Amino acid sequence: MRLTYCNLRCTYCDTEYAFYDGKDMSVQQVIDEVEKYNCKLVEITGGEPLVQLEDCLDLMKNLCDLGYEVMIETGGSLPIKDIDTRVKIIMDLKCPSSGMEKKNLYENIQYLKKNDELKFVIGNREDYEWTIQIIKKNILQGKCEILFSVVFGELEPVELVSWILEDKLDVRFQLQMHKYIWHPETKGV
């Protein structure tokens, strides 16, 4: 589910519609909507879901209590320490080309669990080198899953993969598959 609002303005953002579009709903209304679907996995994304902190925390706790597997995608600029430990966190650290690098809240790293994911969206070689330094400086290897993704249309996936292989990095390469299956600007897929 995609929540509205974001406190960041990344140069490569592909969900600007999530800044303001949306429908006001109570936590219970959201849960009622989720229950209409035959699935037990709920991934909360944005925008930045943690902009709506109290309601978002309440929603995640209630979904976990109801037996759902819950994941949250966050841009890493807002505190994650109060997120229910049953929730899988997928957190970005913003690379220099995003224009939002200074917004990274590095103290969030201490709250990541082994099954959480730390994602770097890489737009160029500078971002790649910066990411390697961040991994080393914060001793991230083995703390959680580390994901490398490309800025769509800026860096060819094969180029990033070749750097990863050349440097023998223990990271997971990730593609936004929906942009390859459907038109890159298709919403709701």
Language-model features: locations:
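Conserved Radical SAM active-site core
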Residues: L3-T4, L8-V87
